[in-house]
């Protein structure tokens, strides 16, 4: 059984006298920097000139270029998008990593797939809140927190574990619980969840359901409501109470349909396909394809994205959402606590 660490399990004053540089001031960077600062940690922000630079200044941070921040800090947390990290690391962080410093990530992709190869004389660890930045920030302000993962890749100083847990505590994670993992496990499970279930699998399921109804002659508007719009109602129940709690809250008719029809849709063949997706993640096939795609300016990515954006479900959805101002109000509220990604 995994061990869960809470505030009382974590050494005090581990980060005292140390400067933490948060590199990037998007959704996660914004939350990490503010939470750490309010936890008494000496925080600086490293970000390029632009909206995020200005926002970080307005939020009261000491803001520098990435290179300047990396030079000043003992602990460097990289919170840039995966596809930007390697380039920024090579140009602005690598040469500032003197012996004994700590290089930190919130996702293991670039280290696990060797896009970033840290020097042998620095600590390398991961602290990953299991929620978006606006939630990390909001729960912290409420006196709570979002559960987090931590992992150690290199422990040169003998203090990497203590620093990782102290960082997790500083952003509020230890109020909810911090779980230990590895860079390999965090990276591979995160990618699998995104591809097979949360994003890829779910998007394909919703679209297939919509197409099945419209191709059978049903109105696209009704297909949208039944296959996409009402999804939030079910996911919220699952999020709060798990699968059993969701089933308790729906009608018996819906629950019986769940039991007898769900396995017909997601059958053994689908599970075998999931295993193939996982295999491509584990052996590096997916990572190689994504890295190359970015190196050639994303031709497939952009073409697929443009096509998907014009699918009938999007056309119908845009019209129907105009009928539901409460949907947009929720989006605007979330945007208030987030800032533009770098």
Swiss-Prot record:
HAMAP family registered for this protein in UniProt: IlvC
Family: Belongs to the ketol-acid reductoisomerase family.
InterPro entries: 6-PGluconate_DH-like_C_sf, KARI, KARI_C, KARI_N, KARI_prok, NAD(P)-bd_dom_sf
Binding site for Mg(2+) 1: 190, 194
Binding site for substrate: 251
One Pfam family from the record: KARI_N
Sequence ranges assigned to domain KARI C-terminal knotted in this UniProt record: 182-327
EC number, as in UniProt: 1.1.1.86
Cofactor(s) needed for function: Mg(2+)
Residues given in the record as Mg(2+) 2 binding sites: 190, 226, 230
Keywords attached to this entry: Amino-acid biosynthesis, Branched-chain amino acid biosynthesis, Magnesium, Metal-binding, NADP, Oxidoreductase
Name under which the protein is recorded: Ketol-acid reductoisomerase (NADP(+))
Organism (species): Bacillus subtilis (strain 168)
PROSITE patterns for the chain: KARI_C, KARI_N
Pathway: Amino-acid biosynthesis; L-isoleucine biosynthesis; L-isoleucine from 2-oxobutanoate: step 2/4; Amino-acid biosynthesis; L-valine biosynthesis; L-valine from pyruvate: step 2/4
GO MF annotations in UniProt: ketol-acid reductoisomerase activity; magnesium ion binding; NADP binding
